[in-house]
Amino acid sequence: MDPYLLLKAIGFFLLVIIGIPGNMFIIIQFVLVKIIEKKLLPTNIILTMLATANLLVIFSRIIFQLLNAIGLEDLLDESECKFMIFTYRVSRAMSIGITSLLSCHQCILLAPSTKVWSYLKQKVSQNAMTIIIILCVLLISMYSYTILISHARKNTTSSPYTLHLIYCDADFVTYTSYTVNGTFYLLRDLILVTLMILSSIYIVYTLLQHERNVRGIRSSDRGQKSSAEYKASRAVILLVALYVILFGLDNSMWVYMLTLSYVNPNMNEIRVFLTSSYASLSPILIIITNPKLKNKLKYSYAKKTLPKNATNNGLVFSISKSDNKDTIR
């Protein structure tokens, strides 16, 4: 097997085995919280929907990249190609949009309690799911054109403005439609990334102010609540940093490719790997920075590894009790 193909197969295989269990764990745990506690904090609603969007990215793109890397050809017919490309475009845009919403929501939570900010805090927190649904409907409408331009790969000569997407092609036919599509993608990502960065800058500034002001009151109830708020903020910053790094690497390669007269297909594969990595790597950050999820994972691990008599004596039960003290958003 060609060394590059082997490396590509291993890379996409790692994304699959990390991404699917990680996103599924987040979704299942927060669904259980909703069922048991009858409520779910707005931030956790956003994280659940982010994990759902990431899971769709994995199923609609990364798995097919893996299958292609190990040599499986011509797996999708015309209708399946349309569905796969449409699902990938919408779910990837949802993943970016929800990450941006998460950073903006956390920024609003940390904003001063003025009349305007208090109103925004209440409205955004109460309508987090509604905002996500509106975003989803908007993106479905915007990407409906992909159904028309997508088709299974053919042996005939394709248009010079055709994007080759694993088993399928997206044919834009004209230079104008090709450039409009590329410009739209770039502007969309730039706007959302700019919102993420601006929100994160404000969060970092607020965190620094917080460190100076609450050193003496960390033991109080207010200090504990505030500490939970700011731990959640740090988690959001890490997620944004991960996306911005991957976005920067991806678009740096894209700009470089524009300067070349001939683009090696391997460079496109690397870009796909970078753009898809967020869907698999972000669950790791979410789990290790969210105490509720982290404690659930520790409890599940302890339950499997402790002897049966230790479980019966209540050692595992004591671990699960500590999980109920978690107050983080």
Regions found by a protein language model. Name each.
Residues M1-R329:
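Transmembrane helical core of 7TM receptor-like proteins
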